[in-house]
Regions:
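Secretory/organelle targeting and membrane-embedding segments
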Residues: 1-175, 179-515
Length: 515
């Protein structure tokens, strides 16, 4: 028994990683046949069930245009789970899980389909969902308004505050990025969503915030006395936040062209990482306190010299992992005159006492040297008074590198004496890796986030204020690029971006860290 919920016979009592268990509920997926649902969302729900973190009566509903029966849907979910789940497939768990699965056939404008969805949820309520429904919109943003309007028209949404009502239960909605394509569209989207659901019932998914290492930024900073006194402009020279991918755009040309790297990942993932890295200690880990501190940082972000504070690139043909790969313009459906960037680097500052004078460099790109996401806090150089000039100017510059993916952990770089009779100094690394230090396996990001939605715990989900502040930071760049028709510079696939990105740091007598 946990918090008054029914005991779950499928829960492994030895699993101590997440002790919170969702109460009676049902989860409805719009866009259930898409890649994200098939590869990430459905396996994550199964993994939660497999770990005993969902109730036996849990309901899972797919909504889509395919002419499927409930059994067809179950077969699709099983195939997805067997191919992509993190935890082993167990027949006893599956038999329990599939009993709560239903499929509703219909288009997003189909009133009859939404009535069928309503009756399906009523049936699941009688089975044990108790009126608690979460709607996951894994669909293009242009379809949000239509789906939300239908949910409201058919009595499936609620404007009541998101508290558990013993009679009617709760209603929540989950939306995936992009949250608009600029500040104006983000405000329009927020007004549409919050006209149907109250703000605290809206969960904007940024899967990066569900990663163990991202949450560990808070633990590392605020539970260790050794780091926080140094976490300011007196000691920190600059901060680099990198999200590098080794793949191209693949089959996403229709989505990616016209969006680009800055809108795709800097506006959300990287600015959220910046906020967590730079924020002040919150009063508590409650959502309102965390969000308040993140919003203060985003509000303080400044662009000091816009024409010299960015670099844009498009990948050209080259070699990746020893294989020849195509360039951006060789991909299907990319127009020859496209100015969409596949690489973007930005320089910003934060106008507050802690970070005054410390630049933050953000970069994201495709077809780079390797897949890696990291936050590198680079400290000011120590005095050369005792040890003389260093041959390499970067030697002696301490760093704390937080690795978000793929090998989650942290590296501290510091100087040490080389063994021998000479006083020779060399940089060395001290590593912490989740896989080496803990026997528990980290939950997949979507596991944590879906569980938080069902529990109604929003600390890891950005509110509309954070989304709008992020667009306020990016919009001046996007407008400048459009007004001046900036053409991204080609860079070879497998490299670390265009020459202009390196020149941006060289102007500041700095260099990008090689991840």
């Amino acid at each position: 028994m946990t918090n008054g919920h029914e005991a779950n016979p499928l829960r492994d009592t030895r699993d101590r990683r997440i002790t919170r268990i969702a109460g009676p509920s049902a989860l409805v997926f719009f866009g259930v046949t898409g890649d994200l649902a098939r590869k990430k969302l459905l396996p994550a729900v199964y993994d939660l069930m497999n770990r005993g973190l969902l109730p036996p009566s849990f309901g899972l509903v797919g909504f889509g245009r395919r002419p499927w029966s409930d059994d067809d849907f179950r077969a699709y979910v099983r195939e997805s789970v067997e191919a992509n789940a993190r935890t082993p497939f167990r027949e006893d768990v599956w038999n329990q899980f599939q009993q709560g699965m239903r499929f509703v056939e219909g288009a997003f404008d189909d009133d009859a389909a939404f009535e069928k969805l309503k009756s399906t949820l009523t049936e699941l309520d009688e089975r044990g969902a108790h009126g608690n429904h979460a709607f996951y919109l894994s669909i293009p943003p242009k379809a949000f308004e239509q789906v939300l309007t239908k949910l409201a028209q058919h009595g499936l949404a609620s404007r009541d505050e998101d508290t558990v009502n013993p009679v009617d239960g709760w209603r929540r909605v989950v939306i995936e990025k992009p949250f608009g394509h600029n500040l104006e569209s983000a405000r329009e989207l927020n007004s549409i969503v919050e006209a149907v659901f109250p703000p605290d019932a809206v969960f904007r998914i940024d899967h990066y915030l569900g990663k163990e290492t991202v949450q560990n930024i808070l633990a590392m900073r605020f539970s260790n006395q050794m780091f926080e006194p140094l976490w300011n402009s007196h000691y920190v020279d600059h901060v680099q936040i990198t999200m590098a991918e080794d793949i191209g755009i693949g089959s996403r040309a229709g989505y990616y062209d016209g969006v680009g790297a800055a809108r795709d990942v800097i506006q959300n993932h990287l600015l959220q990482l910046l906020a967590l890295t730079a924020m002040e200690e919150p009063l508590s880990l409650d959502a309102k306190h965390l969000r308040a501190e993140k919003a203060k940082v985003l509000e303080a972000v400044r662009i000091d010299d816009l024409p010299n504070s960015f670099a844009l690139g498009q990948y050209a043909a080259g070699y990746q992992g020893g294989e020849h790969v195509n360039g951006f313009f060789d991909e299907n459906d990319i127009p020859a005159d496209s100015r969409t960037e596949t690489f973007a680097a930005l320089k910003v500052s934060i106008a507050n006492r802690r970070w005054e004078g410390t630049p933050f460099y953000l970069r994201a790109g495709k077809r780079l040297g390797r897949r890696v996401t990291e936050i590198a806090v680079i400290f000011k150089k120590s005095s050369d008074r005792l040890f003389g000039e260093r041959e390499n100017p970067q030697v002696g510059q301490n760093a704390i590198v937080i690795r978000v993916q793929p090998d989650e952990g942290m590296t501290i770089r510091f100087s040490a004496k080389v063994p021998g009779t000479q006083m020779e100094i060399r940089d060395v690394n001290m590593d912490f890796g989740y896989g080496h230090s803990f026997t528990e396996e980290s939950p997949e990001a979507y596991e944590r986030l879906i569980l938080d939605v069902l529990l109604g715990e929003p600390p890891l989900f950005p509110r509309h204020e954070e989304v709008e502040l992020s667009w306020k930071i990016l919009d001046p760049f996007e407008e400048y690029w459009e007004e001046n028709r900036i053409k991204p510079e080609p860079y070879e696939s497998g490299s670390w971006g265009p020459r202009s990105a390196h020149e941006m740091l060289e102007r500041d007598n700095r260099a990008w860290r090689r991840p």
